[in-house]
Regions:
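Ser/Thr/Asn(+Pro)-rich, low-complexity disordered segments
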Residues: 7, 11, 106-411
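Extracellular polysaccharide-recognition and catalytic grooves
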Residues: 1-158
């Protein structure tokens, strides 16, 4: 037993150091993240290894700072993998860490903390700076760009002694998540260099879309109309509030766009649009949705594309950045959108020219190749970490904290 404990401690120290240098989590879905968090909390509370305990504490600090930066009213935004259409977190949840975060930082008095309530018994507490970031209402608009592990192979290894698949993973492999956070919404997508394969747990059921201020269940996201598990079923590009998607899988599944809250018509059929755009308001935010080909349809309480292979645009806004709802609509309707069957091109005065070739998956932004690579593990106004450095610099309202996983110190 002592030898097993020693080897386990060495493994977890190596695991945390590796994650600190090459990216935190592969998936991001709340149910999978919760399992990892519970394990880390247990290590923190019960290990007698001082160095390991400190590393776990530092790692959890970064996790909660990341949560504070990515969240709107405690609800984590950004792209995630392994979020199933059939699961409640796809449409009305993503709330496991949100409920615990709301309790930690007093974000929502009405929020129930059920799934992770046992973690309150832990002696671990998030750093004060995470609470300050989470509760601040004047953070403005900002980008959060992260590099996470996800490259690997599609090979699944079967171990002889346990009945569980093991997914191969290159720990240094890049999958990039991009999130645009404003005071009223947080929108995110995920992309990767397609020249090398990604592991199945990174490609499976990716969730891309936005969460909104005003309702913990408010969402807009793209999906395929099936409960089956799908892999890399969409490709995307994003800059700021503009997201463009294309279906990346064959099959009869309809392409859908989930919007909540949304008022459906009494009868199914073609959805009324303005110049091809579906406009709406979600509390303090605006949205515009347009398919490059075909129409938007209402069918059995769903918004579907009549041409399921068509690329489509989701453009978000709010009163702060775009004026009135009518101002927002006027601007969007003046933006050129063309599609020749191969490439969709969308122009916005502020965010630039988006080009997406659905045949080759080549993407260009303002005439330059759209990059699915990042130099840093995390990059945003409040936290930065250079890849392979093992150092995170956190800054907020004049306060600076340096997490150094090489020296096991916080300064």
């Amino acid at each position: 037993l002592p030898e097993f404990v020693s080897h386990s401690e060495e493994f977890f120290i190596k695991y945390i150091d590796e994650r600190a240098k090459t990216g935190l989590f592969v998936e991001g879905a709340e149910n999978y993240r919760a399992v990892t968090l519970e394990s880390l909390y247990n290590i923190y509370d019960f290990t007698e290894n001082v160095a390991l305990k400190k590393k776990v504490e530092m790692f959890l600090d970064i996790v909660w700072i990341e949560y504070a930066i990515e969240s709107i009213e405690g609800i984590r935004g950004g792209a995630k993998a392994r979020v199933y259409n059939r699961a409640t977190d796809a449409a009305s949840g993503l709330l496991w860490t949100a409920s615990l975060g709301s309790l930690y930082f007093n974000l929502n008095e009405d929020e129930k903390c059920e799934t992770l309530i046992t973690l309150i018994a832990s002696s671990y507490r998030p750093p004060e700076i995470a609470g300050k970031i989470a509760k601040a209402e004047n953070k403005g608009n900002y980008e959060v760009i992260k590099s996470i592990p996800g490259k690997g192979t599609t090979e699944v290894i079967k171990l002889t002694n346990i009945d569980m698949p093991v997914y191969t993973l290159n720990p240094a492999g890049d999958v990039i998540t991009y999130e645009y956070v404003t005071p009223t919404y947080a929108a995110g997508t995920m992309c990767h260099d397609e020249s090398t394969p990604i592991t199945l747990i990174s490609s499976q059921n990716r969730w891309e879309g936005a969460v909104f201020k005003g309702d913990k269940n408010a969402r807009i996201y793209r999906y395929l109309d099936t409960d089956k598990s799908l892999h890399a079923h969409f490709l995307s590009m994003q800059k700021g509030p503009v997201m463009i998607f294309k279906k990346n899988t064959s099959g009869a599944f309809d392409t859908g766009i989930y919007i909540y809250p949304y008022s459906f018509a009494e009868a199914d059929g073609e959805i009324k649009t303005e110049g091809g755009w579906l406009f709406g308001e979600i509390y303090d935010s605006y949205y515009a949705v347009r398919a490059a080909s075909g129409k938007l349809l209402q069918k059995e309480g769903k918004i579907l594309l009549s041409d399921s292979e068509s690329p489509f645009v989701i453009h978000l806004g709010n009163k702060i950045d775009d004026g009135s709802f009518e101002d927002f609509k006027k601007n969007i309707k003046s933006n050129p959108l063309t599609f020749d069957g191969n490439s969709v091109c969308y122009n916005d005065k502020r965010w630039g020219r988006f080009e997406f070739n659905i045949k080759t998956a080549e993407r260009r932004l303002n005439g330059k190749a759209f990059s699915c690579k990042a130099e840093n593990i995390m990059e945003c106004p409040f936290i930065n970490s250079v890849k392979n450095s093992g150092i995170f610099e956190v800054t907020f309202e004049g306060e600076k904290i340096i997490y150094d996983f090489n020296e096991n110190t916080v300064k």
